[in-house]
Amino acid sequence: MPLVSMKEMLIDAKENGYAVGQYNINNLEFTQAILEASQEENAPVILGVSEGAARYMSGFYTIVKMVEGLMHDLNITIPVAIHLDHGSSFEKCKEAIDAGFTSVMIDASHSPFEENVATTKKVVEYAHEKGVSVEAELGTVGGQEDDVVADGIIYADPKECQELVEKTGIDALAPALGSVHGPYKGEPKLGFKEMEEIGLSTGLPLVLHGGTGIPTKDIQKAIPFGTAKINVNTENQIASAKAVRDVLNNDKEVYDPRKYLGPAREAIKETVKGKIKEFGTSNRAK
C-alpha cells in the first residue's frame, strides 16, 4: 500500500470516536517496531519525524525511501502517513513534501497570530496541491522536543483557533491545552473545557502533543471532544533505552549492536501496541 495523507485517517477517527497515534521515528529500529506493531493490530499509523531526527537519519529523502522499503519487505498493508513534526518554516515543510512526505505540521505558534496565519496559509496552499495534509499549532506546548523548547504552557485561545482554521484551510489543529513534550512533573492538567469549545467551533480533528504520561482516563475524555491524533515519542524512547541498558548491564561482553538494538525494538513494539489499544485504533485500518 502506498503512503497516504493523514486527512482521511483523522476524519474517520473523529467520526468514530478513536484516535490515531503519531509515533516518532528516530532510526531504523523505531520504524520497524512501529510498522510491525501497527500491522499486527491492523491500525492506521502516522510516523512522526522531527527536523532533528531527519538530520540524524541523513535527510527527508532517506527517511521516505527507508519507510517505503520497510513497507515492501514487511508486507505492510495498513494506511501509513509520514508526517513532519514541528516544521519550523515554509521552506522546511516544502523540503519534506518534495521528498515524499505525505503530511506536515507547520509550527508558527511562536510568531504573532497574523504571521502564524500567513505562514500556515502558504504551507497549506503548497501542500494541498500535492495532496499532502497540514497540521498547525496555536498556543505553547511546554517542555522540549529536539530543537523546540518552551519554558511554559500558553493555552490556545478558542476564538483564534476558529479564525486560524477559517483563514488557512488546515486539516488538523494542535491547540496547546496543558500537555508537554517529555516527562511530566506531576499530573498533567488538560483544558477539557477549551478542548470541547475548540472542537465544536472548528469542526476539525484536534491533535494532542506530549501524549506520554497522560493518564488513560484523560485520553478517553479527550477523544469525544474531537482529539483524533495523539503524539507519542518519549515513552518509546524510555522503553528502548531501558532495554539497551538491561542487555549491557547483564552482559559486559556484548558488542554486537543487534544484541541490544533487537530488544530495544521489541520494547518499542510492545509500547506502541499498548498505545494503539489505549487510543482505540486496533482494527481501524481501511
Swiss-Prot record:
Binding residues for D-glyceraldehyde 3-phosphate: 50
GO biological process: fructose 1,6-bisphosphate metabolic process; glycolytic process
Residues reported to bind dihydroxyacetone phosphate: 182, 210-212, 231-234
Disulphide bridges, residue numbers: none
GO MF term list: fructose-bisphosphate aldolase activity; zinc ion binding
Ion transport listed as a keyword: no
Cofactor note: Binds 2 Zn(2+) ions per subunit. One is catalytic and the other provides a structural contribution.
Cofactor(s) it depends on: Zn(2+)
Reaction(s) catalysed (UniProt annotation): beta-D-fructose 1,6-bisphosphate = D-glyceraldehyde 3-phosphate + dihydroxyacetone phosphate
Keywords: Glycolysis, Lyase, Metal-binding, Zinc
UniProt cross-references to Pfam families, sorted A to Z: F_bP_aldolase (PF01116)
Binding positions (Zn(2+) 2): 107, 137
Class of this enzyme: lyase
Pathway: Carbohydrate degradation; glycolysis; D-glyceraldehyde 3-phosphate and glycerone phosphate from D-glucose: step 4/4
Amino-acid positions noted as binding Zn(2+) 1 in the UniProt annotation, renumbered to this chain: 86, 181, 209
Functional description taken from the UniProt entry: Catalyzes the aldol condensation of dihydroxyacetone phosphate (DHAP or glycerone-phosphate) with glyceraldehyde 3-phosphate (G3P) to form fructose 1,6-bisphosphate (FBP) in gluconeogenesis and the reverse reaction in glycolysis.
NCBIfam families: cbbA (TIGR00167), fruc_bis_ald (TIGR01859), PRK08610.1 (NF006376)
Record-stated family: Belongs to the class II fructose-bisphosphate aldolase family.
Name listed for the protein in its UniProt record: Fructose-bisphosphate aldolase
Organism: Staphylococcus aureus (strain Mu50 / ATCC 700699)
